[in-house]
Swiss-Prot record:
Cellular component annotations (GO), alphabetically ordered: cytoplasm; prefoldin complex
Protein name per UniProt: Prefoldin subunit alpha
Locations listed in the record: Cytoplasm
Gene that encodes it: pfdA
Subunit field text: Heterohexamer of two alpha and four beta subunits.
Amino acid sequence: MAQSRERLAEEYSVLAQVAEELQREIQLAQTLIAEVDSAILALKNISSLEDGKEILVPVSAGVYVRASIKRQEKFLVAIGSNILVEKSLDEAVEFLNKRKEELSQLVERRMNDLNKVVARIREIESSIR
């Protein structure tokens, strides 16, 4: 009986860590989804600006640089490994929407995993009491 309780306590501890990691992954993916939405909106807004229009571009940590719009019909899109590809507005938005869908599916899978882990944690809690 004592070994069984020890085993359950160990399993509980491992599952609690797994649940925390799943929650972090879900939160990160949701943050990335919000960034993708923001990028899509920015692309659409920029594409409607006239050539030469001055804008502020964020550099980092609340620092901005003034820039002028040139050739807003093409955008450089990061596709991974520091590789940029020139895409039209429609292509860029399509790429970002695909990325958003992949992230949404990841969130769904991780939520399912988290629900299973939480269910097992509850089983352990009820069996220990």
